[in-house]
Amino acid sequence: MKIVLTADNHLNYYSQKFGAKLAERRGYFGRAWWETIEFAVKNKVDLYLCAGDLFDQVMPRNPPRAKVVEGFRKLKENGIRAFVIGGHHDTPATLSEGATPHNILAKAGLATVFEDVDRFSSEVLEIDGREVCISGMSTDRRLHPGMDPLEGLRIPAEGDFNIALLHYSIVKIVPCGEAEPCIRLSSIEENRDIDIFAMGHYHQRISKKVGSSLVLYPGSTEHNDFGEYKNKTGFWYLEVEGDEVRKEHISTSCQPMNRVYIHTSSLPRDQIMPKLIEEVKKASNPEGLLQLVLKGDLEFEHYSKIDFLKLAMVGNESNFYFEYEDRITPILEGFEHSSSGILEPREELVRLGEAFIEKSQGERDKEIWRRALELALSYYDKAAMEGRR
């Protein structure tokens, strides 16, 4: 039995920061996902499993929907059975939001879609003379942080070989955020008749044995953000013979992505801008995405000479997309921050601003701090007024 397991394809990807380049960025997501279809057909697999977040949104545009229909039709024409669940991005939070975007696949008879979020659905197939049970449950976005989605549930295991599709983090296997529900390891252990847990949600590939069960996360097929720039994108290809599962992680083509960290201690004080521009150009790729992260302490007189506008211009000229993250702590000689008593935010803002103005050397620096204080107070007052409405 041959299987392709994919997840977190995030078709119809959306990020406001790409502006006019969003369509081109989306193209990378679409092409990476399409590689899973072509691989499945070329290798004549028996099963194509999508463990959630095929789409990036509950209501994707028509072009990616049409491409998905084309892909799953290609699978069906080649005798490949497809099974899909919804993930955090493409499962409606409530019934009022409508059906999942995968519903069209079920209606067209192109895939079995397990849409229920609070109970398992299953189907038993005969493959190579064995009964294979595929079960799945879409993500329940109503669950509170810390809740176990499998609590009180038994996963169907009605075959000689059993596979379960889920889209959650599993405690002690992948990081679990404080604001999300997580499957306890004991829930995996209690469902020991499941041979493969085909998982989505975590964007790194994972292969982990829990008792007799194999837990597999394929990771995403394209990088979503700079926090993932080191991840290997792709999907799992599995060959099952008897109780043996041979697995191979197949890489997908992704848009080049890089993140560069520069600490202020490495910056020559008389050549800060030339050094920053040199590092940006060295890390650039005309087709890629680059993030520059600046961190460390820096004397205010040197910090004020960093031309962030020029940095952005050089970065954007040299890359498909560029951004910087300013984590530098400006140090003003003779100023020491201290706090005591009950903090009054607006008063503290004024006190800090006036202190920086007083300690500034030269009228230019003083004017910069005056303007910064005015802007900060205007934003604060606006937010305070909106909060009272």
For the regions a language model picked out, list residue spans one by one:
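Acidic/glycine-enriched edge-of-secondary-structure segments
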Residues: 21-27, 56-57, 133-136, 254-271
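Short, internal active-site loops enriched in acidic
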Residues: 55, 89-90, 296-300
